[in-house]
């Protein structure tokens, strides 16, 4: 789907990769390589930052995670994980649904302040089974 969407939209600077984030985050050019990393309906915030933040460029990159209308407790539980992975304090931004149905959700924005330690992400499956928070 993603390859076809990029082709239909005429996007040229798109590289679709298949694999687990735990493995891909160790590849040169992918780790610390992106200004923006997005995720929607993937996992709790503590797991999500371990899977996604290693891809963001330190000092310039960010993770933007789509969450439901009240992610405060989930974000608070992830505070230690965010710090351990090199993230700055998260910002929760209310967003209107693009579907026009009047639903609201939030975008949780985590700036990448410093490099993620090399021990993260942990091996496949561990971030979900044993979140850092």
Regions found by a protein language model. Name each.
Residues 1-133:
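S-adenosylmethionine
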């Amino acid at each position: 789907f993603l390859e076809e969407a990029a082709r239909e939209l005429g996007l040229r600077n798109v590289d679709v990769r298949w694999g687990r984030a735990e493995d891909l985050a160790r590849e040169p050019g992918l780790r610390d390589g992106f200004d923006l990393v997005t995720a929607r309906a993937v996992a709790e915030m503590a797991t999500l930052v371990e899977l996604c933040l290693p891809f963001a460029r330190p000092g310039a990159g960010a993770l933007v995670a789509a969450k439901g209308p009240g992610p405060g407790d989930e974000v608070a539980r992830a505070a230690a994980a965010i710090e351990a992975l090199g993230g700055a304090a998260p910002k929760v931004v209310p967003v209107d649904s693009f579907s026009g149905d009047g639903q609201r959700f939030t975008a949780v924005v985590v700036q990448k302040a410093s490099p993620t330690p090399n021990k993260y992400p942990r091996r496949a499956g561990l971030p979900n089974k044993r979140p850092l928070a």
